[in-house]
Amino acid sequence: NLMKVIVVVDMQNDFVTGALGTPEAQAIVPTMVERLRELNAGDNLIMFTKDTHYADYMDTQEGKNLPVPHCIEGTPGWSIVKDISSVVDYGSNFCFYSAKDIMKSRVLKNTFGSIRLAEIIKSLLPDNPIDEVILMGVCTDICVVSNAMLIKAFCPEVQVTVDASCCAGVTPERHLAALETMKSCQIKVINE
């Protein structure tokens, strides 16, 4: 039974309706809910990344370049958008470090791309025939592209796909530019 791994990138309140929210991010929520309902079946694994910053955010390199505090651990803005998290009922926020916890998958990250996420997906490969890794979320041109590239680097023989209808960029132009960059790197872009 071939399994798909679905990675929902940073669909947190601060990126949708909060500090860094955009109309485009809000617009993809219903489409994503529908798509996740379809994909939440069989042996498929749905994973969520959570951008996670702390009180020292403004002192970090990211904070100096983007001086907008967001996704501070424990704040409402850090939580995953309710419509999205309610599709897959894993209970409370959960960060896992072992295969037995795999179905309760929350990967916390304080960087755009998560090496931990790529390592976890790679670690599944020996025992699980992964047919495809599908990414969706925000921002197309920052965290989606960063994670797609990392997964492709860690798992070169796995089909990495990005569902454009479930992604939003910092701007619509940057969204499209990121999709083109990913296509150049043999990441499949669907539903444009």
Residue ranges with predicted function:
Residues 108-127:
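Alpha-helical scaffold elements lining the catalytic groove of polysaccharide deacetylases
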Residues 59-60, 117-119, 146-147, 173-174:
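Short, well-ordered secondary-structure micro-motifs
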Residues 131-143, 162-167:
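Glycine-rich anion-binding loop/nest that anchors nucleotide
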Residues 49-52, 110, 138, 165-166:
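Active-site-proximal beta-strand/loop segments in catalytic clefts of secreted hydrolases
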Residues 144-153:
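Short Gly/Thr/Asp-enriched flexible loops that form oxyanion-binding sites at enzyme active sites
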